[in-house]
């Protein structure tokens, strides 16, 4: 086994003379700037209409995967039905991709052609 070696830490106050790599402007206060954080971009999760998926199934999807109550889910389903598509929510990219994948997988398992995709929010 090796014997522990002794380490001596020195601080600037221990050596008042400036080191050769230090600036001559000793005593200047420098304020560190905080990084500017940007919120992550948001993505729309969009449901598209088709001629085969039952309306009740679309309402169920909205309730289960987007935590909507029956009234809101019905309104979104009617928008999908009458306008061809509707936004189900805004999420970060990872969450939006996961929700779209879950909806598409559930629709396929239930043998419905319901399509869910994501679009970048403008």
Swiss-Prot record:
Function: Involved in the modulation of the specificity of the ClpAP-mediated ATP-dependent protein degradation.
Positions of the UniProt region annotated as Disordered: 1-33
GO biological process: protein catabolic process; proteolysis
Family: Belongs to the ClpS family.
Identification of the protein by name: ATP-dependent Clp protease adapter protein ClpS
Pfam family, one: ClpS
Subunit structure: Binds to the N-terminal domain of the chaperone ClpA.
Source organism: Pseudomonas aeruginosa (strain ATCC 15692 / DSM 22644 / CIP 104116 / JCM 14847 / LMG 12228 / 1C / PRS 101 / PAO1)
Cysteine-cysteine disulfides: none
InterPro entries xref list: ClpS, ClpS_core, Ribosomal_bL12_C/ClpS-like
Upper classification of the organism: Bacteria, Pseudomonadati, Pseudomonadota, Gammaproteobacteria, Pseudomonadales
Biased composition, class Basic and acidic residues, residue ranges: 14-24
């Amino acid at each position: 086994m090796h014997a522990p070696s002794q380490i001596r830490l020195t601080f600037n106050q221990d050596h008042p003379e400036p080191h050769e790599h230090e600036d001559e402007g000793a005593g200047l206060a420098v304020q560190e700037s905080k990084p500017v954080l940007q919120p992550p971009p948001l993505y729309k999760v969009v449901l598209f209409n088709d001629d085969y998926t039952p309306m009740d199934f679309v309402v169920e999807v909205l309730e289960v995967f987007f935590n909507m109550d029956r009234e809101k889910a019905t309104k979104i389903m009617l928008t999908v039905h009458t306008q061809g598509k509707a936004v189900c929510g805004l999420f970060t990219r990872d969450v939006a991709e996961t929700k779209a994948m879950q909806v598409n997988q559930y629709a396929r398992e239930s043998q419905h052609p319901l399509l869910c995709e994501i679009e970048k929010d403008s």
